[in-house]
Amino acid sequence: MKVGSGNVLLYWGYFTVLLSVVISSLIVYTQNYIWSWGWMLMFAVGPVISYKQRGCEPAVVTYTDKTISSVWQVFGCMFGLTFVLIAAFCVLYEQSVNFILMLPLSLLYCGLGVSINGIILREKWMIYSPVVAFVLVIYMLMSLINHGPVTVLWYLYFGLSFVVMMIIPGHILNKKAKKQCLKN
């Protein structure tokens, strides 16, 4: 494990929390859900993080590094495919495009990705940190199935789950990596 191992989790975590607070605030302040389109910035931050990480690539790429990278590539494709499929089905069924389903599915994808990374890295705290996100996924999906209200609080719940599932594990991972490097 190298110093900065948790940085990608921190980049995504802090960006998502900031975005959830900004979008929620704009919706509350303006009373207009058009600001929900701000979530599309999530698709823009991926290439920025990848570009920022490009200069930090290690000289030796381990099997673990490749596996973790592959896990996130698969989930990245799932995000994109989910977005395209939701839009396509809305057009197919002649419905207005509503991406609210992206919120619980994104939590599910990110939670699974973090848990799988925890399994690969053998870090129990990382395996189980997405439980908060999973509980919120079930809550959101049940609310959608039962035609419950989708409120601006969902965006804040989304941000909160990223604190628990990405920011905290990112800091713990960096601390462990730094401690391990100091031993060597």
Task: Set out the residue ranges of the language-model regions.
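Terminal transmembrane helical module of multi-pass membrane proteins
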Residues: I116-N184
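Membrane-proximal helix-loop-helix units in multi-pass membrane proteins
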Residues: F75-F134
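Membrane-water interface of alpha-helical transmembrane segments
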Residues: K2-L10, Y33, S69, V97-P104, ...
